[in-house]
Curated annotation (Swiss-Prot):
Keyword Methyltransferase attributed: no
GO cellular component terms, semicolon-separated: cytosol
Organism this protein belongs to: Ruegeria sp. (strain TM1040) (Silicibacter sp.)
Protein name: Phosphoenolpyruvate carboxykinase (ATP)
UniProt GO MF annotations: ATP binding; metal ion binding; phosphoenolpyruvate carboxykinase (ATP) activity
UniProt pathway: Carbohydrate biosynthesis; gluconeogenesis
Binding annotation for Mn(2+): 200, 219, 258
Amino acid sequence: MTSGRVNPNFRLEDQGIEGLGNVYYNLMEPALVQEALSRGEGNLGKGGAFLVTTGKFTGRSPKDKHVVKTASVADTIWWENNAEMSPEGFDALYADMVEHMKGRDYFVQDLVGGADPVHAINVRMVTELAWHNLFIRHLLRRPDREDLDDFIADFTIINCPSFQADPNKHNCRSETVIALNFDRKMILIGGTEYAGENKKSVFTLLNYLLPEKGIMPMHCSANHAKGNPVDTAVFFGLSGTGKTTLSADPDRVLIGDDEHGWASNGTFNFEGGCYAKTINLNPEAEPEIYATTEKFGTVIENMTFDPETFDLNFDDDSLTANMRCAYPLHYISNASASARGGHPKNIIMLTCDAFGVLPPIARLTPAQAMYHFLSGFTSKVAGTERGVTEPEPTFSTCFGAPFMPRRPEVYGNLLREKIAAHGATCWLVNTGWTGGAYGTGSRMPIKATRALLTAALDGSLANAEFRKDPNFGFDVPVAAPGVAEVLLDPRRTWDDKAAYDAQAEKLVQMFSDNFEQYLPYIDEDVKAAAIC
């Protein structure tokens, strides 16, 4: 039996997927919540939020992501970063997954990736779990109902958590698999209930397709000044560095919190929703995000709650530190209706420095911006990937290496060209530790970070006095309104100055060692900006 609204000429049977149980096409939020509840997939929380747990997988499994190596992509995929799968392995995986699906109920959402209609792609998401369908309906962009009648997908994603891959038969690493086949325009996900795999699969897809059109795909959040979309800012950063929190500024209009493109006519969100971390979420510091946790249909992932009152435990990380909520963009009161902005006037690169040696903000030259973009220094925040239980310093190129199918210099050169063409001012912002490394220091005060960003975005920080950092070479403001001067000089925040010097020297060497891999691909300006 099938139900819901769908193009009558583009059902799953028309794609060769037959023998399923009930198939539900493009159900809206109330129906999806009802289906998920009736199937025992979770609980109804306050305000109608849907509370779920994802079992042993509470973060992404980047080592289980594979790209099918065919002639059309063999020379363009960054194979050092993307595990390959043979076409034969994928064919066997697809056949076995479709066989496994027979007789089972499935949910289908026909959605759009990209707020700019010129560059958008149509995505069909087929999920075994009703709440996964609800999740992706929030996170991607929802076409008008009448447009579903002639919707044809450019790519199809099938997510079947109950299916387990056979590494020998399917040419993959483990029983968990995420397999992208650009020739067959299909992504298969199996063996994990973690919902983030759904959205990041679409992101990886766009990160491959858009550079061919001269569009810079970015792992960033974005906002713009009220009444002035030309005054756009983007915030690069790995998961947990503050993209969602810092872009949700009540004094600016939110474009999006995680994935964007920079085209010839400005920036645009890839998504239609947000996926925010909720650990220690504070209603005073982040009122807009906090409010979404009690709105109808918001997916609350891996949070504990009081069994009688259903009050959420925001400080309980017993399931994972990577607890999250997923909600549509319009749940944020100051979100942009178009999800589009101008060319970035300011580019902020967020780093979570677990060493505690970087300043809270630094101004970068275009060459330094290219250097830090390719370096992508940050810390993996607890829970965002399997096995990460405390901050781990890492270099994740483009501030999103797990999602980059092409070589880093492809994205780096696009960024350099865009900065040169539009004159963006670039900043490095440390949301990590101050006064010591992780374990001895403290987390950078969010009020100080917000004050510095406000000054950067309104242009007043450009008029401040700057000093050149002796270790890293960038310019650091000496003073800024609302921020203690001592905080702007990280060495002064350490009790043991010799320990700071040793830690800074260690990080400088790590930067230098990591960047050697990019030296053959960069120009002399960027080489001169390198930290060594």
